[in-house]
């Protein structure tokens, strides 16, 4: 037999899973409803992803080596002093990154289907296949032609509003809303953001997250995020970041407006039967930073590697217990990272006073090094005891001063 796997969702998660599966000789189908989709996304990727996922230089629009943190009272702190010459945060456009990864998987033998999966039939017997009902958009006009596909395993990589998650009753999660405008700036204004990204904090831009100005290929992404309880305020919060960054954005032209949900924690069930969720569908976005691209691709790769290993390169059908090995490995490897970022968000995004403290803390070289090393290489990097004591003292001092600094 040859194992058949359907991967639903053609973003970084889905394509990364498909690539691993097809290399192992597994019959792999990759569904993407919109092949030219420009998904709303800040577009930041860590340095480790470039090498780990073998991304070519042209995928990266900008190499950010400087970050400016801006407090509620508009105190600016420049960070990035600890970066080495060859270290940077990559900024990319999702339509470019997604297209590259999907095409690479297709060239290896993945069957890419331009289609929308509407329904997943769950088999009554463990030995029976899953049936996907989908609209094939390559034929049948705008609505597509309804078709079915039977497979042994399904990977749900179809984002925060995952239909696959609903089909397996994976449970819900709390989420944030991100709103972003792509703005094309005059040449002199764009030059300011050549290697620079900005993060703004304050109640005026987000009561529980942050706002950003990230450089792209020929424009900047200007956006903000907040928890779903505040989603009615999202346009007012966007106006807040536009006001805070107004002088730097003068003469800019809005070329695209985007919004999307950001999961705030993993779903209660990420594997049910022979269906596994990865990326945003599973809830792998980090708190504090809201980063999702790397963890989406990494979770999908780990899931696919588990399928390859437990199926003996596609010679047997893996069980639910087999697929759950991926979850155990994931939680063991990254659980500490998620915990630390959750604590940071709870402590420092609460009030303008704590946000002032957060920005002040970011001026410390030891804090910068710890933060960038953890972000660039996706590990919680332990500091030596003396440095840790210094950071702890700095944190307490900044929190105490925060009330005085807040506007």
Curated annotation (Swiss-Prot):
Pfam families: FAD_binding_3. Its EC number is 1.3.1.83. One of its GO terms (biological process) is photosynthesis. The keyword Metal-binding does not apply. It catalyses: phytyl diphosphate + 3 NADP(+) = geranylgeranyl diphosphate + 3 NADPH + 3 H(+). It comes from the Bacteria. Keywords: Chlorophyll biosynthesis, NADP, Oxidoreductase, Photosynthesis. Gene3D superfamilies: FAD/NAD(P)-binding domain. Pathway: Porphyrin-containing compound metabolism; chlorophyll biosynthesis. GO terms for molecular function: FAD binding; geranylgeranyl diphosphate reductase activity; geranylgeranyl reductase activity; monooxygenase activity. InterPro entries: BchP_ChlP_pln/prok, FAD-bd, FAD/NAD-bd_sf, Geranylgeranyl_Rdtase_fam, Geranylgeranyl_Rdtase_pln/cyn, Geranylgeranyl_reductase. The keyword NADP applies. It is an enzyme of class 1 (oxidoreductase). Catalyzes the stepwise hydrogenation of geranylgeraniol to phytol during chlorophyll A (ChlA) biosynthesis. Belongs to the geranylgeranyl reductase family. ChlP subfamily. This is Geranylgeranyl diphosphate reductase. It comes from Synechocystis sp. (strain ATCC 27184 / PCC 6803 / Kazusa).
């Amino acid at each position: 037999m040859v194992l058949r796997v359907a991967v639903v969702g053609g973003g970084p998660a889905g394509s990364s899973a498909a690539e691993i599966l097809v290399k192992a000789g597994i019959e792999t189908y990759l569904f993407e409803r919109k092949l030219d989709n420009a998904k709303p996304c800040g577009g930041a990727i860590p340095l480790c992803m470039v090498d780990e996922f073998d991304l070519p230089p042209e995928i990266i629009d900008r190499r950010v080596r400087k970050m400016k943190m801006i407090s509620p009272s508009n105190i600016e702190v420049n960070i990035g002093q600890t970066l080495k010459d060859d270290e940077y945060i990559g900024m990319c456009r999702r339509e470019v990154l997604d297209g590259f990864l999907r095409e690479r998987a297709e060239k290896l033998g993945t069957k890419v289907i331009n289609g929308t999966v509407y329904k997943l039939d769950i088999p009554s017997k463990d030995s029976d296949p899953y049936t996907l009902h989908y609209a094939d958009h390559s034929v049948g006009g705008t609505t597509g032609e309804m078709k079915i596909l039977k497979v042994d395993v399904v990977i749900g990589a179809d984002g925060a509003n995952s239909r696959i998650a609903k089909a397996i009753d994976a449970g819900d999660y709390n989420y944030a809303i991100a709103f972003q405008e792509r703005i094309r700036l005059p040449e002199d204004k764009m030059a300011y953001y050549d290697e620079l990204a900005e993060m703004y904090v304050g109640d005026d831009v987000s009561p529980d997250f942050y706002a950003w100005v990230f450089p792209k290929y020929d424009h900047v992404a200007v956006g903000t995020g907040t928890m779903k309880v505040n989603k009615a305020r999202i346009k007012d919060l966007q106006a807040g970041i536009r006001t805070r960054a107004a002088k730097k954005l003068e003469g800019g032209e809005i070329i695209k407006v985007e919004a999307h949900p950001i999961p705030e924690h993993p779903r209660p069930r990420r594997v049910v039967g022979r269906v596994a969720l990865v990326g945003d569908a599973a809830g792998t976005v980090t708190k504090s930073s809201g980063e999702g691209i790397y963890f989406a691709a990494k979770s999908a790769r780990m899931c696919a590697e588990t399928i390859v290993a437990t199926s003996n390169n596609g010679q047997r059908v893996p069980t639910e217990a087999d697929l759950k090995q991926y979850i155990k490995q994931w939680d063991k490897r990254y659980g500490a990272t998620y915990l630390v970022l959750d604590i940071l968000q709870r402590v420092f995004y609460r009030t303008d006073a704590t946000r002032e403290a957060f920005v002040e803390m970011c001026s410390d070289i030891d804090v910068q090094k710890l933060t960038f090393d953890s972000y660039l290489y996706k590990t919680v990097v332990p500091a030596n005891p003396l440095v840790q004591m210094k950071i702890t003292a700095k944190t307490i001092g900044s929190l105490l001063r925060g009330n005085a600094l807040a506007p």
